[in-house]
Swiss-Prot record:
Expressed by the venom gland. Its EC number is 3.4.21.-. This is Protein C activator. It is an enzyme of class 3 (hydrolase).
Length: 15
């Protein structure tokens, strides 16, 4: 992963 979708998924998971 480039580091954009993962970041988004991580943020969504945290929320």
């Amino acid at each position: 992963v480039v580091g954009g979708d993962e970041c988004n998924i991580n943020e969504h998971r945290s929320l």
